[in-house]
A protein has these predicted regions:
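Chitinase-like catalytic core of GlcNAc-active glycosidases
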Residues: 1-76
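A structural motif corresponding to the C-terminal end of an alpha-helix
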Residues: 14-21, 49-50, 76, 106-115, ...
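Substrate-binding cleft of secreted/luminal carbohydrate-active enzymes
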Residues: 122, 127-179
Length: 179
């Protein structure tokens, strides 16, 4: 973990020295729920070492919502992004609007900080299953021959979700991010 922090600090310093206005860092780590205490300690150490002018953001998973360790993780960050896509089994698809809305409401009740919701802006192919589980092709080809099933989200599903969200915007929700 120390090596990660050192590398991150070196990168932000290099970018700033090159004239780039670095305003924050976002950590996208899909920690297992049982590992949230370790993740909290990492974020706490990172927060202590980051310049105070830099914001610290994290991504969060719906699986964390029921964990008693989630508030401690959220306390370390200035903001978060709740990822409500591609968190179910590939057979269930990329996105479930009513379930995502449920997660957003639960998350809003737990987080004391501003947050955004991550929605899918991509598709993927479900190529099949083997002993290791699902073979999913997303950002790079697996070069597997055979038939696959494309997983996408219909624009109307997203529109319906956004309409439901707009009817009762949870506190601290600051917007949507497309992943």
């Amino acid at each position: 973990q120390e090596a990660i922090i050192q590398r991150l600090l070196a990168l932000t310093q290099r970018w700033q020295a090159a004239g780039l206005p670095v305003t924050g860092v976002e950590i996208d780590h899909d920690a297992a729920t049982a590992r949230l205490p370790d993740y909290q300690r990492f974020l706490q150490r990172l927060r202590q070492r980051l310049p105070t002018a830099l914001q610290l953001g994290i991504t969060a998973l719906p699986a964390w919502i029921g964990s008693p360790n989630l508030p401690g993780v959220l306390q370390q960050a200035d903001s978060s992004v709740l990822q409500v896509h591609a968190v179910l089994s590939p057979q269930q698809g990329l996105f479930d609007g009513p379930l995502a809305l449920h997660w957003v409401r639960q998350y809003a009740a737990v987080t004391p900080k501003p947050f955004r919701v991550a929605l899918p802006a991509y598709g993927m192919a479900l190529l099949g299953f083997d002993a290791q589980g699902a073979q999913v092709e997303s950002e790079s080809s697996l070069r597997v021959a055979g038939n696959g099933r494309e997983l996408t989200v219909a624009p109307q599903q997203i529109a319906d979700f956004l309409q439901m969200l707009a009817q009762q915007t949870p506190p601290r929700l600051r917007g949507i991010i497309w992943f």
